[in-house]
């Protein structure tokens, strides 16, 4: 089961942004928004992987905000069956 996790890195420098983009690429995250001094990332993965992301982000950056959305279930349907 996967869950949604949003991490906002605040008060980040240009080097911090580069690091955020590398983390996003490694964990297959989406960059939802970025500004002059912040980056917002969206992760959709298992709770265990999201725990690892949070731990890493806390170690790497001084100021982060975390929002977890809980488990997500997605059903696939075929349009041909309708």
Give the residues covered by each predicted segment.
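Long, contiguous binding/interaction regions
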Residues: 1-82
């Amino acid at each position: 089961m996967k869950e949604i996790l949003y991490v906002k890195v605040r008060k980040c420098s240009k080097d911090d942004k580069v690091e955020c983009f590398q983390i996003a690429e490694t964990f297959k995250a989406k960059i939802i928004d970025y500004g002059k001094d912040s980056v917002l990332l969206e992760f959709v993965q298992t709770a265990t992987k999201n725990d690892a992301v949070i731990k890493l982000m806390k170690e790497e950056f001084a100021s982060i905000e975390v929002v977890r959305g809980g488990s997500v279930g997605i059903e696939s349907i075929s349009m041909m069956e309708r």
